[in-house]
Amino acid sequence: MALKPLHDRVLVRRTESEEKTAGGLIIPDSAKEKPSEGVVVACGEGARKDSGELIAMAVKEGDNILFGKWSGTEVTVDGEELLMMKESDIMGVIV
């Protein structure tokens, strides 16, 4: 199943978090937090003004992004857990 976001929504794949600390300690799965970084998998066309004019998206497929801890809604596409969120939930693009 393919999923294309509508309007100003973005489909994001979380990046894997580190399994070791800087000191070399291994972090068990039960203690890991979900990462707040990800890669944009798909984008909608953008939001529309009241006049109908299209507001272009600031992110594109393949961008590495930073988002809020509680942002988005988890969706499963082809057995893979992804996040669907509004573009406004994205805090920035990692360059």
UniProtKB/Swiss-Prot annotation:
GO terms for biological process: chaperone cofactor-dependent protein refolding. The keyword Cytoplasm applies. GO terms for molecular function: ATP binding; metal ion binding; protein folding chaperone; protein-folding chaperone binding; unfolded protein binding. Pfam families: Cpn10. The keyword Transcription does not apply. It comes from the Bacteria. CDD domains: cpn10. Keywords: Chaperone, Cytoplasm. It is found in: Cytoplasm. InterPro entries: Chaperonin_GroES, Chaperonin_GroES_sf, Chaprnonin_Cpn10_CS, GroES-like_sf. Belongs to the GroES chaperonin family. Heptamer of 7 subunits arranged in a ring. Interacts with the chaperonin GroEL. NCBIfam families: PRK00364.1-2, PRK00364.1-5, PRK00364.2-2, PRK00364.2-4. Together with the chaperonin GroEL, plays an essential role in assisting protein folding. The GroEL-GroES system forms a nano-cage that allows encapsulation of the non-native substrate proteins and provides a physical environment optimized to promote and accelerate protein folding. GroES binds to the apical surface of the GroEL ring, thereby capping the opening of the GroEL channel. This is Co-chaperonin GroES. It comes from Ruegeria sp. (strain TM1040) (Silicibacter sp.). The gene is groES.
